[in-house]
Amino acid sequence: MSEFDHVQFLKTLSSEPGVYCMLDSDNQVIYVGKAKHLKKRVSSYFRSNITDSKTRVLVSNICNVEVTLTNTETEALLLENNLIKKYQPRYNILLRDDKSYPYILLTNHKHPRLAFHRGSRKVKGEYFGPFPSAGAVSESLRLMQKIFPIRQCEDVYYRARSRPCLQYQLKRCSAPCVNKVSDEDYTEQVDYVRKFLTGKSHEVIADLIKKMEAASQQLNFELAAKVRDQIMLLRKMQEQQSISGNFAEMDVVGFAHLNGLNGIHLLMIRDHKVLGSKTYFPKVPKDSSEQEILTSFLGQYYLAPGATGRIAKEIILPFEIQESDVLGQALTQISERKVTLKVVTRGERAQYLQLANKNALNSITVKQSTQDSINKRYAQLKATLRLDDITRMECFDISHTMGENTVASCVVFDSQGPNTKEYRRYNVTGITGGDDYAAMEFALNKRYNKLVDEDKIPDVIFIDGGKGQLGRAEQYFATWPHAKMPLLVGVAKGTSRKPGLETLLIDGGRKTIPMDSDAPALHLIQHIRDESHRFAIAGHRNKRQKQRTQSLLEEINGVGAKRRQTLLKYLGGMQGVKAANIEQLKKVPGISPDMADKIFNHLHDKG
């Protein structure tokens, strides 16, 4: 046990509701909990007869406890989840994927647009959702585009149009930007979209049937056929999405445990339709119970800041959890409507729960199968490179066009695969164009010269290139000041540059590592190399495009940095500037009629 004097501390502890934070010797929060009676709850950790190994390990690391009193247990629950999100304590069960849920946005413009939206609701308009994933929103937008010809383009693109775009030719937009549709007809389609997104698709079909019949009576058979197609698509979508039963708004939470991995599957039902589903794999301390895992998940999922819109009126649980009444009260309070949590054993709700449980188990199986494949690749790579362990690998690549706009990339892989949060790009400057060796040295300097956290020193560094690049990397590491030295491996392409024919170089290229083309370890190296290459090329293209955009406008006398920025922002990038006619250019703030003529003539003389 630590030096923490729990006896003296407990004497001062209040019996009111509140939250407690346990800290270790580094003053880091290692556990956050809440209690209706703080003194009783915190005292329970320091009993002499604790049998739970997880609690014993936790207590052995406690060096201090901080408490915050609250008025009610509900307030304590809300504060607890905010602190868990803030500190990510290692002994708490953590929900790792806590991004805000996406919505469909219908803007309030004269000609409203449909758009994907995630985050704060600063844009004026109507928000529909939430949806379980970005893919669910994209699929819904794609389907609606086929049925309702409402624009989905950005405003800057919309304002810059002088003729219809490809979406109009595909009959997926009615081109209000160039007056191919009347305001009245466009508004009618927007009303249909609004009804459809609020679960009133039957009303939309009824309205469309009336419209089709009226068009037929007026012998407008082209319009009648167009409306008929809309009705058929709507009915097809209804069949795919509809569910039996009167479930207007319900979340079904499935749970499964297999081989040490826990999966929680969330099935979202809104407006009598299954919006979609998603499986979560919370980070769980050893020996956590199923009730603890589910309770922690529900709190972090529904009580996260900005999560009010995702709270369903009815939440179906796979089993009873402790303090479900407190959680229900908290959800009711923040959503300002009655929220019920229940366990069901019969009826259609039970069938959906069975489906959610099945999905949770299936997701675990798939994840473990994928992880097994990753583990196999890592194990073979460790054996091939003769390393005891590999917890972190980095790979560098250089991208440029004829020596210009050089960009270096560094991608990071850990035991789970790509760690995209750690990816970095470096704009290479101060070297001779096309000197890949100097560019590699520049990237290594940028990456490691100010390295403070030795835990981030990789076990292996892959250099995408031959002996020259690897040799320059070894020169850099010759004066490496840290105790841990990464293994440097060059990945040289074969003469045919085909995958599977790569040569692995070590010791400055003096030695090669033979590998079969179908070896799992080689597949892992190819994955890292390809990811580094992709990331470098993407950065290079962005830089090249930015330079092209700036250089073309920089050639125009009188168009300085401020005017360039205004033109690009107002007209939606260089494509918008090029597509604009003189009248549209004159509408840009700060652009006179003479300047508009000059810009238009210069851009079009350039072809």
From Swiss-Prot:
Keyword annotations: Cytoplasm, DNA damage, DNA excision, DNA repair, Excision nuclease, SOS response
InterPro entries: GIY-YIG_endonuc, GIY-YIG_endonuc_sf, GIY-YIG_UvrC_Cho, Hlx-hairpin-Hlx_DNA-bd_motif, RuvA_2-like, UVR_dom, UVR_dom_sf, UvrABC_protein_C
Broad class of the protein's primary localization: cytoplasm
Localisation: Cytoplasm
GO terms for biological process, alphabetical: nucleotide-excision repair; SOS response
Residue ranges annotated for the UVR domain, each copy included: 202-237
Gene3D superfamilies, A to Z: 5' to 3' exonuclease, C-terminal subdomain, GIY-YIG endonuclease, UVR domain, UvrC, RNAse H endonuclease domain
Domain of life: Bacteria
Cellular component per GO, a single term: excinuclease repair complex
GIY-YIG domain residues: 15-93
Function according to Swiss-Prot or TrEMBL: The UvrABC repair system catalyzes the recognition and processing of DNA lesions. UvrC both incises the 5' and 3' sides of the lesion. The N-terminal half is responsible for the 3' incision and the C-terminal half is responsible for the 5' incision.
HAMAP family tied to this protein: UvrC
Record's subunit section: Interacts with UvrB in an incision complex.
Family of this protein: Belongs to the UvrC family.
Protein name in the entry: UvrABC system protein C
Organism of derivation: Pseudoalteromonas translucida (strain TAC 125)
Gene: uvrC
